Amino acid sequence: MKEPWPDAHQRQLAVASVQESLPELDWTLHPAKVKRFSQDFHWFSPILKAQLKEKQADAVVRPRTESELRKLVSACVAHGLPLMMRGAATGNYGQLVPLQGGIMVDMSGFNHICQQREGILRAQAGIRLGEIEKSARATGWELRCMPSTYRQATLGGLFS
């Protein structure tokens, strides 16, 4: 039976190929930084801390536009690379931790309110909930769902 994901060596080659084809993207390859971006607060749990200790992405990429994001996703699919989306990593259950390596997509560059009118707000996935709350309150509205980490948590992370 074929493994669903490439092994570590195949992933390294695939990541290098994707990086070479998309040099305009903001890449992070330094091992300590990649490790940090591959973690949430799962280490609060001694069980998850042990289970996820060695798990991390092979690279982190921060796209700045939808076009860059589309190109990145297409390249990862073409190479069979796992792809994980990262908001602010405020969760504590290990949902963001890459189990099979791959590319971590830092969505922090997607942090704008696109449209706001009475009772409706459309925003990008990387915007912090605190910013949405501030903008909503200025117009007499408020968020209906307020996690304890709302000042740091992102819209995309809340709904993923």
For the regions a protein language model found, what residue spans apply to each?
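N-terminal flexible segment immediately upstream of the FAD-binding catalytic core
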Residues: M1-S74, T90-G119, S148
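FAD-binding core of FAD-dependent oxidoreductases
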Residues: V34, H79-S160
